[in-house]
Structures are given as C-alpha cells and as structure tokens.
A protein has these predicted regions:
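A mature extracytoplasmic/lumenal domain signature
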Residues: 56-58, 66, 110-114, 126, ...
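Bacterial N-terminal signal peptides that target proteins for export
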Residues: 1-11
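N-terminal, post-signal-peptide region of Sec/Tat-exported proteins
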Residues: 45-84
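Short, low-complexity N-terminal intrinsically disordered segments enriched in polar/charged residues
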Residues: 19-54, 58, 153
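Surface-exposed, charged secondary-structure patches
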Residues: 61, 73-121
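Cleavable N-terminal signal peptides
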Residues: 12-13, 23
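Short beta-strand edge/turn micro-motifs at domain boundaries
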Residues: 123-148
Length: 153
C-alpha cells in the first residue's frame, strides 16, 4: 500500500510539473493574465514607479512574508520604494507559473528569484490575485515568501 501511494504521489507530481513547466504552453488567456505581472517586473527593472503602478489595481496591497513575519504595504508605497532611481540593477523572475482563471478573477502562483546586479538576492513564491476590469487584467494583490537560502541560478 505504501509503495502504491508513493507511486500515485509521484505520478501526480510529475503530471503537475509537466502541466506547469513551460511558459510556452500557456493559453492566450493565461498569457493575458501573466502580462500585467511581466509589466510590473519590467517597471521594477527600470526603477520606474509609474510603470510599476500601471498594471496594478488602485488601492491594492502586498503582503511580504520574511522570517515568518508579514510586512504589509500598499501598491503605492511599494512602487515608490522600488521605483526610486538607483545604480543597482534589480530583476525579478518567475518560473513554472500556475494560472487559474474564473471569469474576471485569476490567480498566479509561481516560484521566483529576485536578482540584484545579476546575482540571486532572495527567492520564494509569488502569489498574484488579478481582476479583469473593462477587459483589462490588473493585479489586485500580491503575497510572497522571501528567503535567502536560494541556490545560485
């Protein structure tokens, strides 16, 4: 029984990995949901507060989990903090996103790495809640975990 259960778990994990392993396999609707996430990351890399805010629902919030403690902030505060001009290059990368859509509501769950000057600074999991307003997907809230024990990528 134990071996059978293990085989079922491994088969399920393998199937889940195959389903979420490629961004190229995303449907057009999933790509539309991922577009505002990419736009926010592009704004972050440019250190452009206005570009960071563009794909965000006004009044939205973030919860950043660090060392088991939540830090909450508004999208405006996040954009002002990350959107300040600076000399360091920042980049956030997600991979293997899991996208779920129901009418005008979507969720994206994805592992991420945050790079500073090309080196992994921290990693974790991003969770984006999105809403479709007037035909356009907007990020309504973000939660993430962040830890330093990442393998260098």
């Amino acid at each position: 029984k134990i071996i059978r259960r293990l085989c079922l778990v491994l088969a399920g994990a393998t199937a889940a990995g195959l389903l979420t392993s490629s961004l190229h396999a995303a449907t057009p609707e999933e790509q539309a949901v991922l577009a505002p996430v990419k736009a926010m990351f592009d704004g972050m890399a440019k250190r452009d507060a206005a570009a960071i805010k563009e794909p965000l629902l006004p009044g939205g919030t973030m919860v950043l989990m660090r060392d088991g403690k939540p830090t909450q902030m508004t999208f405006d505060a996040f954009a002002e903090r990350v959107g300040r001009p600076g000399t360091t290059h920042i980049e956030e990368r997600i991979h293997d996103p899991l996208v779920r859509i129901d009418n005008d509501l979507a969720v994206v769950w994805a592992p991420f790495e945050f790079l500073v000057d090309g080196k992994v600074d921290h990693c974790g999991t991003d969770l984006f809640n999105l809403v479709r307003q007037d035909g356009k997907w907007l990020i309504a809230s973000v939660a993430d975990t962040g830890r330093k024990d990442c393998a260098a990528k």
